Each structure stands twice: as structure tokens, then as C-alpha cells.
Amino acid sequence: MPINYDNFYVKPGAATQCHSCPVRSLALFQGVKPEDLEWTQNVREQQYVIKPKRRLLEEGEPPRYSFTLFSGWVAFYQTSVDGNRMISHFALPGDFIGFQAVPGHPMDYSAQALTEVTVCAFPVTQLDEILKNTPELSSRMMTMHAHTMKICRQRMMGIGRKSAKQRLAFLFLELYHRVKFIGELMQGSEENSIVFPLSQEDLADAMGLTSVHISRTLRELTDEGLLSIKHRRLTIYNEPALAEVAHFEKSMVLQDHPLL
């Protein structure tokens, strides 16, 4: 089903200025000099607000826009021939949505808002022209894409080689540390807790498991005193023990940050 762009609402009030953007240090324009930010802002068509469950990209459809995620959570997924969803990645603020090896071709995945999201929208044709003429931005795009693929590979390895308990523990730690990293940059991080809007269905579709299996495994991790999920918050009580279960290291999901 084609994307309904009428579901994209212009962000109320003034659009965020690139020079004061709180996620720019994580995003595509990270390395752009302050004096050059005016032209990057001119590339952006608009800041849009998109409601939960709405799609930003559709598998098999050429996209009109690529996006920088300003706030909220987005799932990248593919749909099997029998209609099942397989989530390959969860995008968080600062992430780029809509990377294509060949710009303008149909997407090989869909992207759906899991929460209300705000995005900076860039027309695909205009952004492609800028990337062709700006090697630094092209390099940054490749770095971001490689990092996303690194996270996806770790998850796929888990699906093929780890138990349900190990897989789920790994996913919790992946998202916990990615969200914490963003929070530290934006001075909004709590000690051992993050906002966690994912449903058991989302977790099942990311892990290749049933919702019943997710519920049982989550209860096991909770009963062992490793974590809890309450009121859309994930709290980790014993990170070393959870990391041992998951065979997890932070370096598996975080990249060196040149501005820190």
C-alpha cells in the first residue's frame, strides 16, 4: 500500500534550527561546520510529526523522502509472503531512515513509527545530488549505514545461534545502551532505566519468536532479578549478569563518537 503523505503533519511552531539541533552530533550532518549549516537546513523540506503505526517507507515503493529521526522510535521491517513481519532494526533519534544503494529505486524494507515521531524530511533526489558533490557527507552516510548493519548482524547471529533467553537479553542491552548513549549526549539519561515503548509483539517480530515465548522468557529474566519492564520503562538491575547471559559487550552496538 503506497505511503499516505497526508498522514505527515508539519511540526507545530518553529522548525528546529540545524545549529541548535540536539541530535545533530549523532546524525548525517554531524561534521558540517557551523558556518555551513544554512545550506544543510535548506536541503530539509520540512519537519514532520508522524503518529504511531504510520509508515514512513514502504517495501517495494520508491521513496519520496529520506529522513533523520529527531525523536521517537521507528522499526525497519520486511514482510514475508504469508504476511508475517520481521523487524531487522530499531531506529532511534539521530538515525538516518531511507538509505539506498541506488537512490530512487523501490525500498527493500518498510519503516513504521512505533511511537509518535518527529523527522527531518529530505527529498531523495535533492539529497542524492548533495551526496554526490560532498564526499564528507557520503563518507558519513557510509559510516552510519555500516554501523546499522553491524547491529543487524549481531541480532541475526543471535537468531541463528542463541537461545531465546540470550537473544532477548542481548536486545534489551543493545537498546538500553543505545538509548543511554543518546541520553548522555542530551543530558537526559537516568541511571539504570530507559523509556521502552516496545510491545511483546514488537519483541517477537524482532526475535523470530512467538509472543507467548517472549512472555515466558521475559518472566524468567524478571524472576532472576535481572530487569523489569513496567509502565513503558526498562530497568536493568544487574547489568553484568545480564551481559553474561547475552554474551554482550557495548562495543558490539556502539560506535566511537568523534565529538566526545
What are these regions (language model features)?
Residues 136-208:
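Polybasic "coupling" helices that flank or enter modular domains
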Residues 47, 90, 121, 197, ...:
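Short aromatic/basic micro-patch
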Residues 28, 54-116:
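Cyclic nucleotide-binding regulatory domains
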Residues 39-40, 57-60, 188:
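Short loop/turn motifs at secondary-structure junctions and domain boundaries
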Residues 1-52, 96-97, 102:
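Cyclic nucleotide-binding regulatory module and flanking cytosolic helices
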Residues 89-154:
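Cyclic-nucleotide recognition modules
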Residues 177-260:
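Phosphate-/nucleic-acid-contacting segments
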